[in-house]
């Protein structure tokens, strides 16, 4: 029995019930509502999940991964060969191509990604040192953080970076569409 059928049967049954029969369910609903209101008085929402961390637009951007470098090279070729493919289908095709690419053939992309990552790490260290004059004087680049908090921030940065990369891909694809 699917939900819509079940719901219809419940509705029909409710309409045929006497007030006395309905009273039992109404009492249960009132008791559940009272329990809910009691629990909500003491409920404290988890910190930091709803607030989005401020991201400085002047901060260095994270470098693309080897896969994204591969995609930026092969996307125009795929679009040229298959102009009717949707963005999602192009992405699937690129993913398949990457997975079928031999490790030796991935090497240039991985090397370039590693170089870009090194440059990013230097840039972000300089950026953080510049943003904190006291830390720069002492030679400290990163403030110490609890492991859990650091992991949460890293997860947020990764999500934001993925969103940025997707936006950049969309912009690149729009530019490619405009060129055609």
Swiss-Prot record:
List the subcellular locations: Nucleus; Chromosome; Cytoplasm; Secreted
**Where is the site labelled Cleavage?**
32-33
- Post-translational modification (record): Phosphorylated at serine residues. Phosphorylation in both NLS regions is required for cytoplasmic translocation followed by secretion.
Q: Where is this region: Cytokine-stimulating activity?
A: 54-73
- Motif Nuclear localization signal (NLS) 1: list the residue ranges: 1-8
Which key words tag this protein in UniProt? Acetylation, Adaptive immunity, ADP-ribosylation, Autophagy, Cell membrane, Chemotaxis, Chromosome, Cytoplasm, Disulfide bond, DNA damage, DNA recombination, DNA repair, DNA-binding, Endosome, Immunity, Inflammatory response, Innate immunity, Isopeptide bond, Membrane, Nucleus, Oxidation, Phosphoprotein, Repeat, Secreted
A GO BP term, please? DNA recombination
Region of interest (Disordered), ranges: 126-180
According to the UniProt record, which cysteines are disulfide-bonded?
none
Which InterPro entries does this UniProt record tie to the protein?
HMG_box_dom, HMG_box_dom_sf, HMG_boxA_CS, HMGB
Task: Specify whether Nuclease is a keyword of the entry.
Answer: no
Biased segments, Acidic residues type? 152-180
In chain numbering, cross-link Isoglutamyl lysine isopeptide (Lys-Gln) (interchain with Q-?) is at 8-9, 33, 145, 147-149
**What are the boundaries of the region Binding to AGER/RAGE?**
115-148
Broad class of the protein's primary localization: nucleus
Q: What is known of its domains?
A: HMG box 2 mediates pro-inflammatory cytokine-stimulating activity and binding to TLR4. However, not involved in mediating immunogenic activity in the context of apoptosis-induced immune tolerance. The acidic C-terminal domain forms a flexible structure which can reversibly interact intramolecularily with the HMG boxes and modulate binding to DNA and other proteins.
| Name listed for the protein in its UniProt record | High mobility group protein B1
What organism is this sequence from? Cricetulus griseus
């Amino acid at each position: 029995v699917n939900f819509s059928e079940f719901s219809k049967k419940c509705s029909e049954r409710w309409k045929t019930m006497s007030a006395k029969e309905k009273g039992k369910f109404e009492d249960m609903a009132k008791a559940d509502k009272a329990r809910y209101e009691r629990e909500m008085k003491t409920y404290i929402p988890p910190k930091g999940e709803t607030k989005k961390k401020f991201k400085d637009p002047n901060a260095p951007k994270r470098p693309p991964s080897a896969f994204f470098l591969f995609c930026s090279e092969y996307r125009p070729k795929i679009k040229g060969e298959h102009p009717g493919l949707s963005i999602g289908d192009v992405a699937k095709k690129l993913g398949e191509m990457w997975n079928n690419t031999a490790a030796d053939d991935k090497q240039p992309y991985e090397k370039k990604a590693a170089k870009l990552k090194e440059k990013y790490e230097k840039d972000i260290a300089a950026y953080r040192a510049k943003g904190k004059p006291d830390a720069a004087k002492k030679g400290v680049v990163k403030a110490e953080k609890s492991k859990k908090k650091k992991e949460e921030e890293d997860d947020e940065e990764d999500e934001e970076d993925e969103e940025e990369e997707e936006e950049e891909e969309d912009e690149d694809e729009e530019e490619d569409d405009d060129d055609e």
